Amino acid sequence: MTRAKRKKEHIDHALSTGQKRQTGLDDITFVHVSLPETELSQVDTSTKIGELFLSSPIFINAMTGGGGKATFEINRALARAAAQTGIPVAVGSQMSALKDPDERPSYEIVRKENMKGLVFANLGSEATVEQAKRAVDMIEADMLQIHLNVIQEIVMPEGDRNFTGRLRRIEDICRSVSVPVAVKEVGFGMSRDTAARLFNVGVQAIDVGGFGGTNFSKIENLRRDKAVEFFDQWGISTAASLAEVSSISGDRPIIASGGIQDALDLAKSIALGASAAGMAGYFLKVLTASGEEALAAEIESLIEDFKRIMTVLGCRTIEQLKKAPLVIKGDTYHWLKARGVDPFVYSMR
């Protein structure tokens, strides 16, 4: 099967499998503030990922590219929506364009349609330093995402089976490229142990890519003759991943992703320690169902709803929201206790 056809299958299956509310974010409840002393018009949603300035913490996370006309049109629409709303946009893995120059336009269109905005490049952890540099140059990227997708690869019929040397390659890339490097999971979550190893080799930001959003095990199982369904429920939830990584990150930025679908999910993610949050599957559904203008309108609505939540919590800035008290219950509470992460840090601040 060609890489382009596989990319198209991924999009189709991502839309058909849907997202389940298994992010753990439903286990999170804010402590209500009856006297917030805030005004909606004074709320500042700006944030930073390292030295990159974002007007709001929402961005369009990596989805696709390298699948011919279909992915070209999707990326063009995503880039236009990002430009219209002033949020960053990430492209999907650029390996296909590095191997086949005919696929470059489906990625280059993102920068062409979003000349002044933040654009993130994307490659897998199998990439070399030279490939990383070419991916950044291809779209004049402001940041490089390196994705970790072991479960997807092991389930994928034609996927990788050798995962040795990945950390060393990531370290080499961090030392060599001219832009910040963020490492992201793709829906299976990240432990504090993995995050610590990545920070130690120079990774500037971690995108936890938690369980509960687009499920690449289910997607790849739809492409297999014999499914390996035990991986369909494999992973660490978005909420647990954020709390784990936040416990060791210090002042290094964390990015939330994995099933984030509304402003409340976004606010909870920030309060758990994220500086920004990427949304992919939800935005793809809005785009394919209602079009580019509807997507831009939905992004604007999300930002306004997010401001409302910050207002009632008494938070004028993202840094204040990161300190908002919340209570962790249910499976997320038990996971964190078992892992030695104190959930009461959040409720008693």
UniProtKB/Swiss-Prot annotation:
GO molecular function, one term: oxidoreductase activity
EC number annotated for this UniProt entry: 5.3.3.2
Keyword Transport: no
Residues annotated to bind substrate: 6-7, 152
A Pfam family annotated for this UniProt entry: FMN_dh
Catalysed conversion reaction: isopentenyl diphosphate = dimethylallyl diphosphate
Any one GO cellular component localisation term in the record: cytoplasm
SMART domains: IMPDH
Listed name of the protein: Isopentenyl-diphosphate delta-isomerase
Lineage: Bacteria, Bacillati, Bacillota, Bacilli, Bacillales
